Amino acid sequence: MSSRFLKISVFIQKYRTPLLLIGCGGVFSANIFYHIFPDHTYKKVYQAWHKGEPASLSEKLQNIFQEVLKDSSISTSGNFSAFAAFGFHPVGAGVPWLPSGAQIGIPANFNSSTADLEGITNRTILINGKELEWDSDSGVALKNSLVFSLEAQKFAIAREVARLGSGGPILHAAVAPVCLAGACVYSVALKQIFRFQAGSIIFRGVVNLLSLGLGVMTYVLAADSVSQWLDYRSDRRAAGLSRDYAKGGLEFYEKILTRNKTLRSLMGQKGEEMYAPSGNLFPAHLLQLRHATYTSRRDRILNLLKNENV
């Protein structure tokens, strides 16, 4: 057993650089895979269905989508395509300059207006196993939080266009391989500092474990930082298109916060565990805050409006 372990250690030491390159390439490929083929991965997961068939995007939303691409100065609109998605706000995946392009899912409630709520009230929503009554006080509050003005709809789509158009998926996918390479650098540096290169295999193993721990911690912090930076940047780019877009962004986040507060009340204890009193999402893990909070994103757009930076 010990001889086999020794052979593996010698092999890793001998081919350390090629193995590191293969490992980093594999991790990057795994993270970017669904962005390379969004038609066959992301779209299939988020596609909305109606009567057993994929729902089609309405002409109204197709026109809004094209307007956003034009406002965003996207010269090759063929690299972006939209589909009808489930949920209550747009989602997106893909890399626009790759052959498969980028896919942006637009939810059915974007078809709704204060005069026509069909995209919302024709859904059955179960909360704690009970069907939500849209005519109840909570139902009316939730319904109102799901109706967005044209400006808010355009902002929500524009932020996805900005995120994908600026290479957000590639930046996020690059975090893990960079941290993996960093863990190897930690290991080599610590061994040289404490002169463990030719020392006991036990000490080297401890150093490797310590380096791995540092790499994991670096990844957690870096992944969150990159995600939040991308969130803020896409918001700023979308809000910077015009003052109407910025006002739409303010409305969009205000209504998300209102929706979450309503759901917190409706869901009882589970809602209190999921949503903060402010309407922000509680992080899934203690040390992770994957995305920027809704209140901070709203406040940044409000500052843009106050400072006339749009």
UniProtKB/Swiss-Prot annotation:
Keywords from the named record: Membrane, Mitochondrion, Mitochondrion inner membrane, Transmembrane, Transmembrane helix
Membrane topology (Mitochondrial intermembrane): 39-169, 222-310
GO cellular component terms listed in the entry, alphabetical order: membrane; mitochondrial inner membrane
Membrane-crossing residue ranges in chain numbering: 18-38, 170-190, 201-221
Membrane topology per record: Multi-pass membrane protein
InterPro entries per record: TMEM177
Ranges per topology, Mitochondrial matrix: 1-17, 191-200
Subcellular location: Mitochondrion inner membrane
Transmembrane in keyword set: yes
Role summary: Plays a role in the early steps of cytochrome c oxidase subunit II (MT-CO2/COX2) maturation and is required for the stabilization of COX20 and the newly synthesized MT-CO2/COX2 protein.
Similarity comment: Belongs to the TMEM177 family.
Name this polypeptide is given: Transmembrane protein 177
